[in-house]
Amino acid sequence: MRRIEIVLGELERLTRGLCLADLAQETAFTAEAIGFNLGLARNSVSKDLNQLWNDGLAIKSRGRPVYFLHRQALETLLGRQLEESEREVRSVADVLPHEEHYAPDDPFTSLIGYDRSLRDAVEKGRAAVLYPHGLHVLLTGPSGVGKTFFAELMHRFACEQASGAIPPLVYFNCAEYAHNPELLSSHLFGHRQGAFTGANEHKTGLVEQADGGYLLLDEVHRLSYEGQEKLFSILDKGEYRPLGVSSQPRSISVRLICATTEPVGSALLRTFQRRIQVCIDLPGIHQRSVEEQIELIVGFLQRESRKIERTVSIDKPLLLWLLNKPLEGNIGQLKSDIQFLCAQAWASGMTEHNDTLQLDKRLAEMSVNPTPEQRLLVDTLFEGKARLNIDARTLPALKTSLATGAEIEESDLFYSFLTREYVNLRNSNVPPAETLAILKNKLSSIFEYGLYSRDSVAHPPRYGDQIEERVTLLIGCVEQVLGFSLPENLVNPLRKHFLALIGYVQRGLIPQLYSSSLILDRCKDEYDNATLLCRKINELLHIQCPATEVVWLCLFLKECRHYRQRIDASPDCGVILIAHGATTATSQAQYVNRVLERELFSAIDMPFEQSVHDTLETLTQMIQTRQYRRLILLVDIGSLIHFGSTISKLFQIDVLLMPNITLTSLLEVGLDLSYETSDLPQLTALLQSKNIPCQLCTPQQENGGKVLVISCITGMGTAEKIKKVLEESFGELMSQDTRMVILDYNEVRSLERVQQALNASERLAGIVGTFQPGLPDIPFISLEELFSEQGPELVLSLLTPDLSNAERRLEMERSAMRFISALTMESIINHISVLNPQRILKEMEGVFNHLTSSLSLKPSRQVTLRFLIHCCCMVERIVINRKPLQMALESQPNLDARAFSVIKSAFLPIEDAYAIRLSDAEYFYIYELLYS
């Protein structure tokens, strides 16, 4: 074969490995790159390529260096014949077809994600504007997703479509007058002079100002139901009346755009919802694709670049941190965070006089564990560089780069990436050694992304029976080498890879590239097994297995062994980390798991607003679900250190508790579990020998007991009464392991002084008192909370934090009535002087139980308390005065006659026992009390 034919074949092979996105990125091939692949001199290859161009078999670009593409392969890719004028082009991208976009005057195109995650939202917004006379719109989504910005885009789009006057956009935040319906009416609809006190002149409302345009009602959920109903006439008929006007209503042409962060069903009237024709839900930032998140970050950095008139430079770790940072405020919070990062960098570099603002990982608050997709796209974006420089021209080029990384849809990501990346690097004149180093760094990320992408989990299409049988035999060979069967989530991507490999080899798309340095260090022990499997591929699939397949097989075999290790690593022994903070435990566990290359640690985060009981409930559910028979529990501070004995008693298992955990001790435990022992007594001794604090909790250990401290600033007398109420209500639960201690308020403010009141083996369960003493992580119940609806439940959470939700509900039913009785007794003792308080209270409880059962009532604790106190005092009043309350009753058309009759019947035993008669007025008051 002549040299020119070899060059033509290589050019065709390389061109067929391209896609349209590559052409958009100006990807083509130089004489040097082709010469490197074939081992030929650059000048000889250049001569042959120019001859091929003269013969019409290749096209080339003008400029230096000169790029070439195979003409027929390019026409196949484009799906059209090239014109004669296109034999030589200014740039490779010139041969691409013109893409269809929205008209350039469409404001929605400035919205990142308008053609992807926000496509449905944009189409709904455009439809609402374009429909004759427009449609009303409800925008929903969490805070900070850009609802106001979306409404402004709708208005700008309406302005572009308007043939006459520009429609106005009037903004109103419904929270401003949420609690004053009259001022709300005046502000929205206007008022006439004299409509109310202080209305000295006519006022135009926002509705009239928005006539012919849009009224944006932000935070519409803050409107009361009455406020929502005031808008019905506009929504239904396009009419309204200013405040104080009773004449003919005024016609109006206004479209409402309502925005809310709350669930629509709970915040808005159903009758209000159905009057709004279009509902648009905007997703949170972490529901957007990774490429959109990167575009948002770069867009905000580009905005700061224009503001400060400098290039902004960011490194890879900081960009990954921004992608993984928890953002409760979504896009709005991201914008503020980026502004703050730029301000920090500006302040730290004020003494330096350069044109670049440097942002780097030192500004990040914590380490992150990025996903393979994030690493892939960020690697694609940085193109092997250490930093990304952002200025006014960055975003358009970035979108093309991200599209290349995100749209890889070929049947096998590994080889499609390898081919494309290799070609790009060689065309960039990167030396061979550096090319291998760059590829090696990226292969692990691309492998993980391809293996665990959602597309890989789905069932791939089936091929001919003969090929399927051979691929199945190959999978069996892999399982034989590994020594265990593969789960379906690994079989599917393996099968898909083998089927794709056949096509790539037959089309000659795999570059003749191989070096042992491409195999990651952690995978080199799988080299012999991978080589054996390559021979099996040659034998079963009848193809020449490329040397690069050894690299993929090494990665796959190592991942399978890690998977097996995660499954087999003491499945009966859980290792759980709990730490204060929204993501502290998760971040630390992910970091250590990545270092150890196994999923060893599970994490439970404890945000600031989460209670100790809720955290314990999460822990117990995790243990129940995973059926652990042993547990290693790692915690940081506070009440979490008591979870060890609680879990040990609750599940009757051994628990190794490690308090005051740090990242260093986490790594130490992980290494010991991986390479030393998972036996808890042996592990305890090993850790203690390294001076790492730990404690082995067993079910047989005696519980040291709990102490509940009661303290009132009003004096010891009040504290004694509270103690008495709690003993009568929850005495059975306290048994021998809980005691109550009364302390002066000044003593409670110091944790050291509180500890002095405890025995060495006791722990502080919580504090009940007047004011919050401010002790860190010590549960506190105020008197207001104690006597509220949630009072008994709060006390139960202190005394029995290890109860399940079902057990807690059962105990609540038992204790709630005793709690109410105890409170009622304390109250009626102060008001009853003639009757026996215990007797009358017991009788009234019987009446109350009869009423709730007969009338199917579920009254609140407040209603129960009021009923018992009122009825006990009522009976004593009638006994002393010898006559009931006498008052004229108005006609009550809504009175439930049956319920009224049941109430009368229930009090007959009381009337007989105390020789009294209750009037209808007394019964009516009791009726109102129960049904209020």
Curated annotation (Swiss-Prot):
<comment type="function">
    <text>Involved in the regulation of the catabolism of D-glucosaminate.</text>
</comment>
<dbReference type="InterPro" id="IPR003593">
    <property type="entry name" value="AAA+_ATPase"/>
</dbReference>
<keyword id="KW-0418">Kinase</keyword>
<dbReference type="GO" id="GO:0003677">
    <property type="term" value="F:DNA binding"/>
</dbReference>
<dbReference type="GO" id="GO:0006355">
    <property type="term" value="P:regulation of DNA-templated transcription"/>
</dbReference>
<dbReference type="Pfam" id="PF00874">
    <property type="entry name" value="PRD"/>
</dbReference>
<dbReference type="GO" id="GO:0016020">
    <property type="term" value="C:membrane"/>
</dbReference>
<feature type="binding site">
    <location>
        <begin position="141"/>
        <end position="148"/>
    </location>
    <ligand>
        <name>ATP</name>
    </ligand>
</feature>
<dbReference type="Pfam" id="PF00158">
    <property type="entry name" value="Sigma54_activat"/>
</dbReference>
<feature type="domain" description="PRD 2">
    <location>
        <begin position="835"/>
        <end position="932"/>
    </location>
</feature>
<dbReference type="InterPro" id="IPR011608">
    <property type="entry name" value="PRD"/>
</dbReference>
<feature type="modified residue" description="Phosphohistidine">
    <location>
        <position position="870"/>
    </location>
</feature>
<keyword id="KW-0067">ATP-binding</keyword>
<keyword id="KW-0010">Activator</keyword>
<dbReference type="InterPro" id="IPR036662">
    <property type="entry name" value="PTS_EIIA_man-typ_sf"/>
</dbReference>
<keyword id="KW-0805">Transcription regulation</keyword>
<dbReference type="GO" id="GO:0016301">
    <property type="term" value="F:kinase activity"/>
</dbReference>
<dbReference type="GO" id="GO:0009401">
    <property type="term" value="P:phosphoenolpyruvate-dependent sugar phosphotransferase system"/>
</dbReference>
<feature type="domain" description="PTS EIIA type-4">
    <location>
        <begin position="572"/>
        <end position="708"/>
    </location>
</feature>
<keyword id="KW-0238">DNA-binding</keyword>
<dbReference type="InterPro" id="IPR036634">
    <property type="entry name" value="PRD_sf"/>
</dbReference>
<feature type="domain" description="PRD 1">
    <location>
        <begin position="462"/>
        <end position="567"/>
    </location>
</feature>
<dbReference type="GO" id="GO:0005524">
    <property type="term" value="F:ATP binding"/>
</dbReference>
<keyword id="KW-0808">Transferase</keyword>
<keyword id="KW-0677">Repeat</keyword>
<dbReference type="InterPro" id="IPR027417">
    <property type="entry name" value="P-loop_NTPase"/>
</dbReference>
<keyword id="KW-0598">Phosphotransferase system</keyword>
<keyword id="KW-0597">Phosphoprotein</keyword>
<dbReference type="InterPro" id="IPR004701">
    <property type="entry name" value="PTS_EIIA_man-typ"/>
</dbReference>
<feature type="domain" description="Sigma-54 factor interaction">
    <location>
        <begin position="111"/>
        <end position="343"/>
    </location>
</feature>
<dbReference type="InterPro" id="IPR002078">
    <property type="entry name" value="Sigma_54_int"/>
</dbReference>
<keyword id="KW-0547">Nucleotide-binding</keyword>
<feature type="modified residue" description="Phosphohistidine">
    <location>
        <position position="497"/>
    </location>
</feature>
<protein>
    <recommendedName>
        <fullName>Transcriptional regulatory protein DagR</fullName>
        <ecNumber>2.7.1.-</ecNumber>
    </recommendedName>
</protein>
<dbReference type="GO" id="GO:0016887">
    <property type="term" value="F:ATP hydrolysis activity"/>
</dbReference>
<feature type="active site" description="Tele-phosphohistidine intermediate">
    <location>
        <position position="580"/>
    </location>
</feature>
<keyword id="KW-0804">Transcription</keyword>
<feature type="binding site">
    <location>
        <begin position="210"/>
        <end position="219"/>
    </location>
    <ligand>
        <name>ATP</name>
    </ligand>
</feature>
